[in-house]
């Protein structure tokens, strides 16, 4: 793969290797040279061996090949004539301490003198051979030349800004934008009964509720509700499609503000297959014993000790990979959840066990940043419902696929109040489900960081077709441009096809001079197959021992430890501090070393979460992923 002129300048001191066959007499240009970024892989595969006398790119540009050479031939002195001489950059001297001294008056720098005569602009340059130019004003205006303004009075020194001086706006008082109150109600038991109600810390679910839930869509052929207590965690389950909080708004409150009532101790879990028993999932599924297929305690997973209100939805055969099929399963489940929400609305405030106050502040004068979350947008379960009426509800929400996958801005509190109902896809280990957004670690970390002014959270869909990917990505770039931010986080779930637009998002934001920190599951199996020069600051969400998608729910998703690393990296990038180039191959020690550095600088301990090795061995791990153990 050849390089561009811009890339050749950046890699002037890297070694020069032909990317393709070149004939004798060829004048070497960027189009003849291989990308140095892939040399390591080529060497590992035995396709490339670089000798000690290999020339650098800056030395070979413009030189003539004296004999024909094949692709992947390192360019050495005997192959070329007219080799350039390049000098190494002089080492930067350490900046000395500033010395106070009287400030001398600075005379204005000599500038070309412009005179306007009639419709002509005459320029006299008192250098060299006294060049005089006469240019029509209509053309001069296009060149950006304007008529001279009045000169400053003689003897008055005009202020001159230092080349390195930065104008920093004074930090103002934090501005409270909106608040959200969450009232928590404790649930200790879930049982079936004649009606849906909440009484004495117990949820009672109407015994015949499934008879009505199945009528929500003609694609739903059956639905069952199973109450899973901690004693039942070893039971078999079909693939987990979503994990959802049970919450409802008080009064006419909207998502992201007002008061939300939340149930503690129980969650909704959506599972299902089609009539032929095919799991409603793509590239991996988490069917099996629950205790062996869930990474408990992750932002998007159940917590140990919670009661799981698990629906098992059956949809018509062959509809599991069509948009209406998975959506029907979610709608049928939400019918049941809504009855519980209505019961939750009726509880007296005396039963509140905890009141959580969330506040969104803007911080004038602090580093303004934006969080960009790439979500799936190919259809089927590759979809998300944005801003329902109820937290993680269905009614009132708009699918991002129907919105064209274009960027949609949410406030941090809208995200944390159930503003995203995820129809999750990709492998279970790296999918971000509805509960993940309800407890989104990066949003929480950045929103509460007093050194940042969080402008908002942008959700952008990942379409299937490349042309649509780049269209959406360009809209994202334009949106971020209007925000005038100083830094950006870009996250994605899963891996593979979505990395194409993930890379494009980095380019669209980075080309506007904005430092970007990217977050994705990569490691071994999800390694990036595309990239660009703006993808310098990356955080890998991998937790798995082998660096793979092992189909354990939420194993490789963004967690608090990743958010802390990303925040530290963006602060370093904004400050233009050195960030070492990533290693070519996955090395888990990189993460551990970075965590140690952050702990040392911040003076606080970062808790690293366990991975699948603490779980009972699942069937898939035993037969596929860890068969050699």
Curated annotation (Swiss-Prot):
Protein name: D-proline reductase proprotein PrdA
Protein species of origin: Acetoanaerobium sticklandii (strain ATCC 12662 / DSM 519 / JCM 1433 / CCUG 9281 / NCIMB 10654 / HF) (Clostridium sticklandii)
Further remarks about this protein from its record: The reaction mechanism first involves the formation of an adduct (and not a Schiff base) between the nitrogen of proline and the pyruvoyl group of the alpha subunit. The selenol anion of selenocysteine in PrdB nucleophilically attacks the alpha-carbon, resulting in cleavage of the N-C bond of the proline ring. This intermediate is then transformed to the oxidized gamma subunit containing a mixed selenide/sulfide group and to the 5-aminovalerate adduct of the alpha subunit. The final product, 5-aminovalerate, is formed by hydrolysis.
Modified residues (Pyruvic acid (Cys)): 425
Annotated InterPro entries: D_pro_red_PrdA, Gly_reductase_pB_sua/b
Function, in words: D-proline reductase catalyzes the reductive cleavage of a C-N bond in D-proline resulting in the formation of 5-aminovalerate. The alpha subunit has been shown to bind D-proline, presumably via the pyruvoyl group.
Enzyme Commission (EC) number: 1.21.4.1
Protein encoded by which gene: prdA
Signal peptide from the UniProt entry: none
GO-annotated molecular function: D-proline reductase activity
């Amino acid at each position: 793969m050849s390089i561009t002129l811009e890339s050749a300048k950046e890699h002037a001191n890297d070694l020069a290797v032909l990317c393709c066959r070149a004939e004798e007499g060829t004048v070497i240009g960027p189009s003849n040279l291989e990308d140095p970024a892939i040399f390591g892989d080529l060497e590992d595969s035995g396709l490339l061996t670089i000798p000690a006398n290999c020339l650098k790119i800056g030395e070979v540009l413009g030189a003539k090949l004296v004999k024909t050479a094949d692709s992947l031939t390192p360019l050495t002195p005997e192959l070329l004539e007219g080799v350039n001489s390049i000098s190494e950059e002089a080492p930067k001297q350490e900046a000395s301490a500033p010395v106070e001294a009287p400030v001398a008056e600075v005379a204005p720098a000599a500038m070309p003198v412009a005179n306007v005569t009639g419709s002509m602009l005459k320029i006299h340059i008192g250098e060299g051979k006294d060049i005089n130019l006469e240019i029509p004003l209509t053309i001069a205006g296009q060149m950006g030349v304007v008529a001279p303004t009045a000169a400053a009075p003689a003897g008055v020194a005009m202020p001159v800004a230092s080349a390195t001086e930065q104008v920093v706006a004074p930090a103002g008082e934090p501005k409270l934008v909106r608040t959200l109150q969450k009232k928590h109600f404790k649930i200790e038991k879930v049982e079936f009964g004649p009606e849906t109600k909440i009484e004495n810390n117990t949820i009672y679910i109407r015994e015949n509720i499934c008879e009505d839930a199945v009528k929500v869509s003609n694609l739903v052929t059956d639905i069952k509700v199973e109450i899973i207590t901690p004693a039942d965690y070893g039971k078999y389950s079909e693939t987990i499609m979503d994990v959802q909080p049970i919450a409802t708004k008080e009064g006419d409150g909207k998502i992201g503000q007002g008061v939300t009532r939340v149930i503690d101790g129980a969650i909704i879990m959506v599972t299902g297959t089609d009539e032929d028993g095919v799991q409603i999932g793509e590239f991996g599924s988490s069917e099996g014993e629950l205790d062996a297929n869930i990474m408990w305690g992750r932002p998007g997973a159940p917590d140990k000790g919670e009661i799981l209100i698990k629906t098992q939805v059956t949809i018509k055969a062959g509809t599991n990979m069509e948009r209406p099929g998975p959506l029907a399963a979610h709608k049928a489940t939400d019918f049941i959840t809504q009855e519980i929400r209505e019961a939750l609305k009726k509880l007296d405030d005396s039963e509140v066990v905890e009141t959580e106050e969330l506040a969104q502040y803007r911080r004038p004068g602090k580093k303004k940043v934006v969080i960009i979350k790439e979500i799936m947008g190919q259809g089927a379960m590759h979809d998300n419902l944005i801003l329902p009426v109820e937290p993680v509800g269905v009614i009132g929400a708009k699918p991002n696929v129907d919105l064209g996958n274009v960027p949609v801005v949410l406030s941090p509190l809208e995200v944390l109040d159930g503003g995203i109902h995820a129809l999750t896809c990709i492998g279970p280990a790296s999918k971000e489900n509805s509960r993940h957004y309800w407890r989104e670690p990066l949003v929480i970390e950045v929103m509460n960081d007093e050194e940042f002014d969080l402008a908002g959270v942008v959700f952008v869909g990942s379409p299937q077709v490349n042309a649509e990917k780049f269209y959406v990505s360009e809209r994202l770039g334009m949106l971020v441009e209007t925000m005038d931010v100083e830094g950006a986080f870009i996250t994605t779930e899963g891996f593979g096809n979505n990395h194409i637009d993930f890379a494009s998002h980095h380019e669209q934001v980075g080309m506007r001079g904005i430092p970007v920190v990217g977050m994705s599951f990569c490691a071994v199996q999800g390694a990036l197959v595309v990239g660009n020069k703006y993808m310098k600051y990356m955080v890998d969400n991998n937790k798995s021992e082998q660096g793979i998608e092992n189909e354990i729910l939420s194993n490789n998703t963004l967690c608090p430890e990743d958010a802390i690393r990303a925040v530290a990296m963006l602060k370093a990038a904004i400050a233009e501090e050195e960030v070492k180039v990533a290693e070519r191959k996955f090395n888990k020690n990189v993460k551990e070393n970075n965590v140690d550095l952050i702990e040392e600088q911040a003076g606080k301990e970062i808790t690293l979460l366990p991975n699948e090795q603490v779980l009972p061995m699942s069937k898939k791990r035993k037969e596929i992923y860890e068969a050699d153990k």
